[in-house]
């Protein structure tokens, strides 16, 4: 029984370290990647994709046009 508890605790600790590593990596990449403060986020007016933030696109079709939306693809 003690062996199973020790293995479970080791598994939990390893998982926590792995998740923290990914979180730290994303935080570092945010610092490295230069972001334009003037870029458009959700519902910001746009005329082209360059008006929107990174990974966001200018909606050209649908009910609402010429707004920035996140690119899921």
Swiss-Prot record:
It is found in: Secreted. Its main location: secreted. It comes from the Eukaryota. Disulfide bonds join 39-53, 46-58, 52-68. GO terms for cellular component: extracellular region. Residues 1-20 form the signal peptide. InterPro entries: Huwentoxin-1. Residues 21-35 form a propeptide. GO terms for molecular function: ion channel inhibitor activity; sodium channel regulator activity; toxin activity. Keywords: Amidation, Disulfide bond, Ion channel impairing toxin, Neurotoxin, Secreted, Signal, Toxin, Voltage-gated sodium channel impairing toxin. Expressed by the venom gland. The keyword Cytoplasm does not apply. The modification Phenylalanine amide is found at residue 72. Belongs to the neurotoxin 10 (Hwtx-1) family. The presence of a 'disulfide through disulfide knot' structurally defines this protein as a knottin. Hardly affects the DUM voltage-gated potassium channels (Kv) (15.4% inhibition at 10 uM) and the DUM high-voltage-activated calcium channels (HVA Cav). Does not affect or only very weakly voltage-gated sodium channels Nav1.3/SNC3A (<10% at 15 uM), Nav1.4//SNC4A (<10% at 15 uM), Nav1.5/SNC5A (no inhibition at 15 uM), Nav1.7/SNC9A (no inhibition at 15 uM), and Nav1.8/SNC10A (no inhibition at 15 uM), HVA Cav, and Kv in rat dorsal root ganglion (DRG) neurons. Insecticidal toxin that potently and irreversibly blocks voltage-gated sodium channels (Nav) in cockroach dorsal unpaired median (DUM) neurons (IC(50)=833.7 nM). It does not change both the steady-state activation and inactivation curves, suggesting it acts as a pore blocker (possibly at Nav site 1). Does not show toxicity when intraperitoneally injected into mouse. This is Mu-sparatoxin-Hv2.
């Amino acid at each position: 029984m003690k062996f199973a508890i020790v293995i479970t605790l080791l598994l939990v600790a390893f998982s926590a370290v792995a998740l923290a590593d990914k979180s730290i990596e994303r935080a570092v990449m945010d610092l490295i990647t230069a972001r334009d403060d003037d870029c458009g986020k959700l519902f910001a007016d746009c005329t082209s994709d360059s008006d929107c933030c990174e990974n966001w696109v200018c909606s050209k079709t649908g009910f609402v046009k010429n707004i920035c939306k996140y690119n899921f693809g």
